[in-house]
Every structure is written in structure tokens, then in C-alpha cells.
Amino acid sequence: MQLYSIASGSSGNCIYLGEEDGGILIDAGISRKRIVTGLERKGLSLDDIKAIFITHEHSDHISGLGPVLRKNPIPVYATADTVSAIWEKTNMNNISPELFHSIRPEEEIEAGEMLVRPFSISHDAVDPVCYTVEKQGKRAAVATDMGCFDDTIIRVLGQCDSVLIEANHDINMLQVGPYPYSLKMRILGNKGHLSNTSC
């Protein structure tokens, strides 16, 4: 199973998991054009995507979702509160609500030959999750936007063959950097983002 970061960071997030013949996306927080270009680099297209799994409703994780779904009616999976927040925050005109499927943490979802399982995380969103993906006895995890971790997350990640985990700041650089104090505290908090050191 390939794990390929099409984009990561505050400007947008989109991860591909699968094989040469298709797979899934985790998040669609960049333009449709950038997603298409990223997939083309791997010899893939949006027609090869079996499902899109959303971690949470922040714009850097969903901004490309509407444009993708208008041209490619791909099933979308997210927690019920996240689905509601997506519909409230983004332009979903001309998109069928039937594409959206509400899921619960620890629920197992089949996407082609892959088993996808969400797990709860701590972040400042309505009901954020990350995902493990299993295929042919191999398990990978995508763990982004976590403010902290606990024994459950350590156990989940410890059962994986590979893990893509986000750590997005050096504490000292953040503290002396140009961000407003409130943003610094948000990033450093338990519902923010892991630092390079804590990761």
C-alpha cells in the first residue's frame, strides 16, 4: 500500500493511500486542480478514488471537496458533526447529500479492498478523527492536526506498519515568531498541533 502526501500544511492537506490501480483520499483541502496534478504524478486520476475520508471541517482539509464532488461524485465519509459542519461552512450547491456518509470512531468502513477505521483525536474542531487503513494484512495511519496524544492513540499507532504523523512547529521559533499571541496559544494547546519535540 502506498501512502503519498499530495499536500500538507496550513495551506491545504490531501493524502492518497492505495495502489497503482486506485485507493482513497484523506482530506481534500486543496484545489481540485492540485489534487488532479498530484494524482497524475502517480499515474492516477480522480476516477481511481473509491472514497474521500475527512478528518475535520477546517478549510485546509475541505476547501477542494465541493469542486471535486461536482465533477466526480465520490463517496465522502466523516463523523456526523463534521458532515453537518461541512454543509454549513462550504458551498455544496449541486452536490447530492447522498454522497455523504456519517461514521463513528472505531467503526470499520470498507473502501474497495481497504478497511478504514477512524479514531478520535484532540483538536479544535467539532468531532475530529484520524484514520488507520488496512489492506492485505498491512496497516498504515494518517495522524494529523493532533494537539496531544494519549495511551489510546499510542496503542493505535503502535499497531501500524507505517505512520504519517504531523508535527508542524518548533516551540522556540513559534514563541518568538510573528504570529499573534492568541494563535500561538491555539497552536501550542492540547487542541492545537503537535510540536516537533512532542512528536
State where each predicted segment sits.
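Active-site metal-binding motif and surrounding structural segment of the metallo-beta-lactamase
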Residues: 33-78
